[in-house]
Amino acid sequence: MKRKTLTFLLIISTILLTGCIKRDDMEGIDIITTIYPIEYVTKRLYQDNANITSIYPHGVNIEEYKLTNKQLKDFSNNDLLIYNGNSNDREYATIILEKNKNIKIIDASYGLEETYSKSDIWLNPSNILMLAQNIKQELSDYIDNPYLKQEIENNYKLLKLDISELDTELNRTAKNSTNKKIISYDESLKFLEKYGFEVINLISENKEIDSNMLNCIDEFCCV
């Protein structure tokens, strides 16, 4: 009897160690994301509980990169799509959902501040925190297992701490800066204005650098 009990315990231990028993239907699933900030946040929150990849190859210009019909069909075979509904990502999300009515979706953009570029989503601490809140909440809504939910909550708290430290550092830098002017090629750094910086965009709406901008550059370089 003792030998049977020991054998049973060994089998159970082996199953648990090899991960053969899933705690939740959302564990071990295949998740696709769009832009890198969403991929990063999802990996920070869900870590090894799912296979997480982006629809965009790393290093490509997502403004110019176009997915093929075959790629969209392949991506539709995944279990969950997380995307930015404030961009053309929603077009891809619509196509993928049409190809697979059962795929779960999360729009991570709810409540985001106005963005001036895709870079603004990644660089702005307020936006990255909102992404994290949305993804955490939507993942928790899909998950039944309380332990997995708590794991995501703990990961969120660590990520929130990192974001808060970045926000504090930006405030400290702005406060201690004698020259608060920042020259940027585009509007991707415009969010820094809320910290007290003056952001000067080299490229205006007509794509030309005017004399006022040249004077600003000269003043900045001579400081």
Q: Language-model segments: which ranges?
A:
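Extracytoplasmic metal-acquisition and chelation regions
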Residues: 19-223
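Secretory targeting signatures
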Residues: 1-20
